[in-house]
Design a protein with these regions (language model features):
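Glycine-rich NAD(P)-binding loop of the Rossmann-fold in SDR/ketoreductase-type enzymes
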Residues: 13, 42-53, 90, 94, ...
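NAD(P)-dependent short-chain dehydrogenase/reductase
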Residues: 108-153
Length: 235
């Protein structure tokens, strides 16, 4: 733990455990989420109900706190005609993005001072996300040439720090680095290359996000591309 920090254990599913973590705080950063499971009910309980519990506790015990919530770029519809912008249509059907979108709506409808960061594919520091790509691509039919917006862990922190400054108050903001990357490239970087394909892409803009608003608000990635991360040894 950093010097001066105090750890308080809580459970988003148990509202009674939340007040001790919130009393007197000036800011709340909500990064908790559940998605690596086939239990859709558990996803909804964690992401929708858990967020609502945290919002209610914040309204009661830290109503003046700045509330920064991590969401996902997966909320956008797949059939975009360009990289997704914050005002674009969002009608997700899968449990994870749908539950995150409802959580966003709950926060936006609260009386709190909020900001929402829609994150792309996040990787870095050996978190295992890149290593999953060679296995997940065939399972989910990901085209090797499909490109995704990405961001390193460091730049999630960069975005959170900017949000905590107040620059993103009352906004939903896409976060992404400077260069989208293909599934093929991610598998190569993971050390387990995929077969290529000349089949046409469907929904080629799915997974791509436009970070222009973030740039206007002061965000610049400290890890500009996934290849910079590879050179630094921080994949």
């Amino acid at each position: 733990m950093p010097a001066g920090a105090t750890s308080v254990r809580g459970d988003l599913a148990d509202p009674d455990t939340l007040p001790p973590a919130l009393e007197g705080v000036e800011a709340i950063v909500h990064l908790a989420a559940l998605f690596r499971t086939e239990d859709e009910d558990a996803i909804w309980r964690a992401n929708r109900d858990g967020t609502r519990n945290l919002i209610a506790a914040a309204e009661a015990h830290a109503p003046a706190a700045r509330f920064v919530m991590a969401s996902t770029g997966n909320v956008y519809d797949d059939d975009q005609v360009r990289p997704s912008r914050e005002g674009d249509r969002c009608t997700p059907t899968a449990a994870y993005p749908a539950s995150k979108l409802v959580a966003e709506e709950s926060l936006r409808g609260s009386g709190l001072n909020w900001s929402i960061l829609r994150l792309p594919f996040v990787y870095g520091d050996g978190d295992g996300h890149l290593a999953m790509i060679p296995r997940m691509a065939p399972r989910f039919g990901l085209h090797p040439a499909h490109t995704y917006s990405v961001a390193h862990h460091r730049d999630v922190m960069t975005a959170v720090e900017i949000a905590l400054s107040g620059a993103m108050d009352g906004r939903i903001v896409n976060i992404a680095d400077d260069r989208p990357v293909t599934v093929y490239e991610m598998a190569e970087l993971a050390g387990d290359p995929l077969e290529g394909s000349a089949e046409p892409l469907t929904d080629p803009w799915s997974g791509r996000m436009d970070p222009s608003l973030a740039h206007q608000l002061g965000f610049r990635p400290t890890v500009p591309t996934i290849y910079d991360a590879a050179r630094e040894g921080i994949l």
